[in-house]
Amino acid sequence: FCGSLVDRIVPGRIRDPKEVAELEQKHGYADPLLDVGEVFGVWVIEGDTKLNDILPFRKAGLEDHVFVTPDMSPYKKRKVRILNGAHTGFVLGAYLAGFDIVRDCMHDETILGYMNKMLLQEVVPILPLDQDDCKKFAAAVEDRFNNPFVNHELMSISLNSTSKWRARNMPSFLEYIEKNGKLPTCLTMSFAAYIAFYSNNIQELNDKGLVCKRAKGNEYTISDDRYVLEFYNAHKDDDIPTLVHAVMTNEQMWGQDLTKVAGFEEATVKNLTLIREQGAMAAYKSCL
């Protein structure tokens, strides 16, 4: 058995009836699990180079898409910190600001600028990987997110954002502080956006998840571990400082007490206040 890593954005079954009808007409058959993926695709297989003979992908002309390596951890770190970290870093605030799909976010100067600053100034420089390779990978993220054929919904990406921020963003956040001795502006804001998304005008907690309401007027349902949803529902009436402190000291969520990170609690109270009072777009703009 070989460990492997796939890097390709496949947003899930198409739910737009019009788009489904057009594709079924084009291809001549009905598919209840119809999906669309991006052209970009990488498959990393961890194992001995002899696998190139057993699995002859290179002979099939796929040497730019399938890689056999004795250690896939650099590829995993690059993908999780840059591609996945970008998603979790901006989508929650972007959704609160009224956006629904990733591509539209790439057409907004503020969100795009925020994402690029986060990646190029706060994430890439602290990765112990080839910097030129990471910069190229980060530069390609904008094009991948701007794919005109993939309607990647922000709510789909928001699934389990607590564990996602911990795995994708928190390592970069902590390593940046260790290296630079200060808080990373955009990654710090992304945590406040996470709290804002999970606590925005909570309506109810039901079997499907935690129901909140955004400024655009629609309700949205957060899907996450039940203990996370119950936590935010229990703290729905907290003022901002109390809520931030409760979130940061919840070691079940983060594996540590985040209030011990110098200045982080104060910065998050300030950022969450800005999001609540002026909106997520103003908060992202303040980072630029």
Regions found by a protein language model. Name each.
Residues F1-L288:
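Substrate/ligand-engaging "lid" and interaction regions
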